[in-house]
């Protein structure tokens, strides 16, 4: 166990390890407003949840770092934690790690190995709130009024819909980020259109996670070289509306109504 894992007493770490971090993660998500996520062993990414094997529950942010009772981990480090757990529980199942995000209500209904309990969640909350050194690891959410599981939904795939709804409700342009080069870690990502944002006059960009330096959003996707285009956003938006009108309209209405309610 390395030094960054000693934010909490060992008996607590051992208990949270045995229950896959579920109570700790829910407690941390309640405190911070960040994203509840479960890592599963899955034969394929969209495998039914009843066929996947749960591994660990953690909290994510708008970046790629992961937080659980052991502290802050990058993706590569966290995978080294998950792989031995997957090997132990596989029972002959072949596959890889599938990371899925959930609301708290959804998480309570999942077929997890260990079910969360309110008493242990409250105990974890009390412990976390006493650990300033741990809480300092975690960034503050810019716009906690948007539930994290919804923000995650509008981060990938539906980012265009969010940007369009934000544009329609204001005066700023929706702009596509077109990628010509990724970092090595993201080198398998598709070149071309990647994400849509609202560009502000001060040069900052806004997506579902809030207004922030564009560089922060680029880092999330591992973008090195890129260009910006309002025309490309319009093209992608129209393509989505044309190809999947029911899905598009449902997604648009959902976020548009939420934005109106919090404006």
Go through each PLM region and give its residues.
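A structural boundary/capping signal
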Residues: 1-263
